[in-house]
């Protein structure tokens, strides 16, 4: 299995927290070629958070990093991302192992 840096996004992903998460993901990306964003603990996600999430993913892609996104089927983040039909842009995985395999 690929050695991946995992970033647990916990709590709200919104205008007030996006910069902190961008910094955390940037730090993780500096240590690994594969980054997994685990949204399991996200309990609030607004439009600024969705925009920030895709800005983070675009930055990883621009750096040539592989990435996976964990958003369990019954989680809050998954429901919103599906309502917005964003799973057509990024694959949402059920587990970290699945996300790591998907990123490989």
Locate predicted features.
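A charged, well-structured terminal subsegment
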Residues: 91-104
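Short beta-strand/loop segment at the start of cytosolic alpha/beta domains
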Residues: 1-8
């Amino acid at each position: 299995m690929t050695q991946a840096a995992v970033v647990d996004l916990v709590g709200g992903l919104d205008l007030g927290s996006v910069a902190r998460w961008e910094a955390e993901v940037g730090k993780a990306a500096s240590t690994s070629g594969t980054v997994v964003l685990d949204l399991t603990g996200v309990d609030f996600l607004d439009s600024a958070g969705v925009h920030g999430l895709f800005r983070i993913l675009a930055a990883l892609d621009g750096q040539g990093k592989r990435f996976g996104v964990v958003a369990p089927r019954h989680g809050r983040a998954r429901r919103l991302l599906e309502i917005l039909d964003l799973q057509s842009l990024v694959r949402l995985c059920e587990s970290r192992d699945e996300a790591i395999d998907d990123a490989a």
